Each structure stands twice: as structure tokens, then as C-alpha cells.
Amino acid sequence: MNILLIGGSGKFCEKLIKYGDGHSFLTPPKKLLDVREFSSIEYFFQHYDTEFDYVIHAGAITRPMVVHEENPTLSIQTNVIGTANVVMLCKEYNKKLIYISTDYVYSGTDGNYKETDAVKPFTNYGRSKLAGECCVQMYDNNLILRIAMTTKPFPHTKALKDMKKSYMYTDDAAKITLKLLDETGIINVGGESQSVYEFVKKENPDIGFNYLSEISDVKMATDCSMNTTRLKEILDDTII
């Protein structure tokens, strides 16, 4: 498959390329394809139309989370307007759009969220990603992946004991994404429900721990874990 990666300089896209044997990737730098500028994306689609059939949109402002609270305009320009621009060009040029979303679109209190459960983001980051999802859903040829992932090795010296997620490492998330390219709708992508500390400790027994009350400068979820039944059914009950 011929795939345009938006956000291609990020760690997740690096893993897609690493595990993407048999696929051909276009990874334009931001100066060539800036999602905030419609004309920039339009120019790229016009000149490289025949070189890709799929678009994986992983370009977004993510961390630090406080940025989205202090400067929501930045989130809107990139995560919302930028995504809308991508959607419009995918529609015009008939490209399959795979949108990389997040577990932060859920309310983050009850856990075990299904794709069909109500969404109620608790941060501006989550709101910006949900707004992106809404734009994507206005185009039929789409796939939305709500992924809970982190880099390996874990980038911090301590991990949260009182936050539950369905974390998986970016390597695994990339492998799974490449298996799902021809699916449609919304799919939760993640591992088992557990605290961040429990997840990290399996790879790093010496990891320290902390609590939300000690580290958070913005509101954070206590349980964003996801129900991944649909994912397991698609992959024949095998996560990796």
C-alpha cells in the first residue's frame, strides 16, 4: 500500500515505517505539508496524488498537556482546523483516511470504555481530538483509532499508581495499525486495563511510582481504560 504519513517525524510514525515492510511511505516534513494551512496540503495532494492511496493522520499537538489549557488556540489550529483541512483534501482526492485519536476522548472516570460509549473529554487536548474525530466522521472513507500508547523505554523515572489505562508501547500500536488499514469506523487500540505503574513495571522492575496529586498541573483521568473486544475480534483474538 502507498501511504502518506502526516506527522511523519513523530515516534509513532517512525515505528510505522519500521514495521511497514511491503508498504511505501511518503513522509513530508512540516515545511512541505503544514496541516494548519489548507493551501499547503492542497499543493501536496495536487503534486503527489498518484503516489498514495491511504493517509494516516498522526500529526497533532499532544504534550505537555498544560499547553492545551494555556493556549487552546494552538490546539484548535492544529488538532481541529488542521484535521478538517486533511479531511477535505482526502474527500476531494478520494483517499482512505486513518485518524489517530486517543483514549482522552472518554470521560476518564469509569473505565472499560467501548467505542459506542458516550464521549466526554475532560481536557482541552481530549476536546481537540474529539473535534478532529467529528470532522473525520463527515467523510465516509475513514477509520478512527483511539490508541493508548507510550514510548519504550518509558520516558519518566516514575509511573502513576492511581491512573488506569490500556497502555501499549508504540511498537505494538504501529504493528496493529498496519493490520487495520482496511477497517472502518472506530476501534479502541490498547492493552489490558491496569495502572500505569503496573504496565511499566513489567519492562522496568526498578521504576518508581507517584500519584496524580503529586504531579498533575492539569485535570487528569483516573481510569481511561478501554474495552478492546472489537480489536480482538478483528485480529482473531490476538493483540500482536
Predicted regions and their residues:
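NAD(P)H-binding glycine-rich loop region in Rossmannoid oxidoreductase-like domains
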Residues: F38-T78, L89
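Active-site Tyr-X1-5-Lys
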Residues: K120-A148
